[in-house]
UniProtKB/Swiss-Prot annotation:
The lineage of its organism: Bacteria, Pseudomonadati, Chlorobiota, Chlorobiia, Chlorobiales. InterPro entries: CinA, CinA-like_C, CinA_C, CinA_KH, Competence-induced_CinA, MoaB/Mog-like_dom_sf, MoaB/Mog_dom. This is CinA-like protein. Belongs to the CinA family. It comes from the Bacteria.
Length: 429
């Protein structure tokens, strides 16, 4: 079984929205062994929808459509499918009950103008919408299209995702004879080309059916090890062997396999070793604290964060010496060190991380260009003294990109420091 995804909506073609629905659907289908061979974005024009769906149904077993099921005039997907398949609609009692309940739960009456949201194309299987109002459906398209299946879902991500999890994936699971396994390998502190050179031998020795994809992004490089085959046990074995080989070769740069984030990894290391952390931020403006506290359970290890953006704030809130600021400038390792010391002593945490830099687009100089970042790490030692580590880094990007990269670098330095303090830990998956 192979699939195509058709995303309907003028906003996708005008750049108004990013098509996150397609990536979610593709990943979900991959999990049940259904590869996606094409993703198409289509306007709200009824004739265009018919043309695109006719082409997709003629070359694949399964077409999943998002968008165009709402109650407004520009929602034309249902009408287009009715014309394409030459079928009418019927009211679904179950869909109508869910729609009425949705309005009742909000203290409202169901408007007559929205009853159409409870209609489905004849011969289709209802895909209930427990989050919104538009009913989804699974349609067998008959011999004209080789008995291919068509799935219609709303374009609202939360509604589509709920439908995929509860109805669509269970419906098609087991219909594919192909086993597919994708394993993300998360790296930090190494570039794409350097990583490729490091694991060249492992890539040359990939078993049949296994591929390796490099996905560079703002903060680092993710690898995705993908294995395809007919026997699930063999697919899992081959995939695991490749992942283990990469871990053995490049483990010092790998913080997780799977969907674990760097902040989750740092948090797990802190929690498992009964350690606490505090942060002092300038250029990241609270982003580092935000990422650390995005992790559920972070109250067990996160003590506090101080945003000391101005020089006066660095002096007043953290005790940074004015002479240090005057001698080295705010963006310097000596200031980063004093910021880390200040928040460590004031918070009572075991570890402190500081950031001071130039996010841009202005404010740079010849020796400190835009994208310069200084990080300070301070950690309590068993004898009561404080160990320090500082570093200067150079980034390139927009202000928003630099702030994101600065926070990632700070988390990376915290991760590296923790590995030295508590020893290498099992890679999170």
């Amino acid at each position: 079984m192979i699939a195509e995804i058709v995303s309907i909506g003028d906003e996708l073609l005008k750049g108004g929205k990013v098509n996150t629905n397609a990536s979610f659907i593709a990943a979900a289908l991959g999990g049940i062994g259904v590869p996606v061979i094409r993703i198409v974005a289509c306007s709200d024009d009824e004739d265009q929808i018919i043309t695109v769906l006719s082409e997709s149904l003629s070359r694949t077993d399964l077409v999943l459509v998002t968008g165009g099921l709402g109650p407004t005039r520009d929602d034309r997907t249902k009408k287009a499918v009715m014309r394409l398949l030459q079928r009418s609609v019927v009211e679904s009692e179950e869909a109508f009950h869910m729609l009425a309940s949705w309005f009742t739960a909000r203290g409202r009456m169901l408007p007559d103008t929205l009853r159409d949201q409870a209609t489905i194309i004849e011969g289709s299987v209802l895909v209930p919408n427990s989050v919104g109002t538009a009913a989804g459906m699974i349609i067998s398209c008959g011999e004209r299209f080789g008995n291919s299946s068509l799935v219609l879902m709303p374009g609202v991500p939360s509604e589509m995702q709920e439908m995929m999890r509860k109805t669509v994936i269970p419906f098609f699971a087991g219909q594919s004879t192909t086993a597919i396994l994708h394993t993300p390998v998360k790296t930090v502190g190494i570039g794409e080309s350097a990583l490729a050179d490091l694991i060249a031998a492992e890539e040359d020795a990939l078993p049949e059916g296994t591929t390796l994809a490099y996905l560079p992004h703002t903060a680092g490089v993710d690898l995705v090890v993908s294995t395809v085959g007919s026997i699930t046990e063999v697919v899992e074995r081959d995939n695991r062997r490749v992942v283990d080989a990469i871990l053995s070769r490049a483990g010092r740069f790998i913080y997780a396999t799977g969907d674990t984030t760097l902040e989750e990894t740092v948090g797990r290391m802190l929690a498992e070793n009964s350690l606490s952390i505090a942060v002092a931020e300038s250029c990241t403006g609270g982003l580092l604290a935000s990422r650390l506290t995005d992790v559920p359970g972070s109250s067990a290890y996160f003590q506090q964060g101080i945003i000391s953006y101005s020089n006066d704030a660095k002096v007043q809130l953290l005790g940074v010496d004015r002479m240090t600021l005057e001698a080295f400038g705010a963006v310097s390792e000596p200031v980063a060190k004093e910021m880390a010391r200040g928040v460590l002593e004031r918070s009572g945490a075991d570890i402190a991380v500081s950031t001071t830099g130039i996010a841009g687009p202005s404010g740079g100089s010849g020796d400190k260009p835009v994208g310069t970042l200084c990080i300070g790490i301070a950690g309590k030692k068993s004898d009561g003294s404080i160990a320090f580590r500082t570093g200067t880094f150079r980034m390139a990007g927009t202000r928003a990109q630099n702030k994101q990269r600065f926070s990632e670098a700070a988390l990376r330095e915290a991760w590296t420091y923790l590995q030295e303090v508590v020893g290498p830990v099992r890679v999170a998956g």
